[in-house]
């Protein structure tokens, strides 16, 4: 696959510009070319994000870098090939070599990515962030780094520790700090202030609603495997209707453009 570096750089710049504190970039995560097309045709869609959990599940693997990096990159490539929007990829913890993984993701058409710390020492993960930044510069693009601290997801939900980690990652070259699990108004507001608005969160039925997160100044909101959950629930309900000898659902006729 030949990469148009100029077009890729423009997409990277557009992705970065879409991170707006108070008017957040909303990402409905995709896991294959089909789901990416469905999301891309939705009004207001500015970018496509992948979800590692969903891609792994679709390939029969558990989450957590159990899917080989080559298969993950191929899934990213297939997604980027069918949409004209910027693609930001969930690169888990970088597969042991964040620089090489980011370089491969860029070759696959991604212009941004998540890198999670899994509670590694902040200085260690900052090295991965710096390697990702260097990989983007070597490719001639501003690779948009969404650096994740797992303090709320896997740790003790310590606000000060999350802030310290996030600031370390920003200093290392991250563009936004992803804090999954941070859910109270007070904590979200504190994180927004600490990161000068460069806060990324994951939304769910249990989180604060989108409009409140926007009012608090969040810059980016994704749904992770939640979009796969929506699709699976629709398939489950349709299957139950058919297997009970019910009517053929009208939604069976839907096809995304180009599919």
Residue ranges and their predicted role:
Residues 244:
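Active-site-adjacent C-terminal substructures of enzyme catalytic domains
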Residues 234-235, 239-241, 258-259:
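Ligand-binding clefts/hinges and TM-proximal coupling segments of bilobed small-molecule sensing domains
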Residues 2-237:
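Alpha/beta enzyme core
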Residues 249-259:
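A short, charged, Gly/Pro-tolerant segment at domain boundaries
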């Amino acid at each position: 696959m030949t990469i148009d570096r100029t077009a890729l750089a423009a997409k990277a710049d557009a992705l970065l510009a879409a991170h707006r504190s108070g008017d957040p970039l909303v990402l409905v995560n995709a896991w294959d070319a089909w789901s990416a097309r469905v999301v891309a045709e939705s009004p207001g869609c500015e970018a496509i994000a992948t979800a590692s959990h969903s891609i792994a599940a679709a390939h029969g693997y558990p989450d957590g870098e159990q899917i080989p990096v080559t298969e993950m990159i191929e899934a990213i490539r297939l997604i980027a090939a069918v949409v004209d929007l910027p693609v930001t990829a969930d690169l888990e913890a970088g597969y042991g070599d964040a620089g090489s993984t980011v370089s491969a993701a860029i070759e696959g058409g991604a212009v941004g990515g998540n890198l999670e710390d899994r509670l590694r020492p902040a200085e260690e993960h900052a090295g991965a962030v710096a390697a990702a930044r260097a990989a983007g510069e070597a490719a001639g693009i501003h690779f948009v780094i969404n650096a994740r601290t797992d303090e709320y997801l896997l740790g003790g939900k310590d606000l000060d520790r999350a802030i310290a980690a996030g600031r370390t990652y920003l200093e290392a070259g991250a563009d936004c700090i992803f804090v999954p699990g941070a859910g109270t108004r007070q904590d979200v507001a504190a994180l927004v202030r600490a990161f000068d608005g460069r806060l990324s969160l994951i939304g769910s039925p249990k989180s604060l609603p989108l409009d409140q997160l926007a009012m608090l100044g969040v810059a980016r909101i994704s749904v992770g495997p939640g979009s796969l959950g929506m699709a699976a629930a629709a398939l489950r309900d349709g299957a139950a209707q058919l297997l009970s000898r019910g009517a053929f659902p009208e939604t069976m006729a839907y096809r995304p453009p180009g599919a």
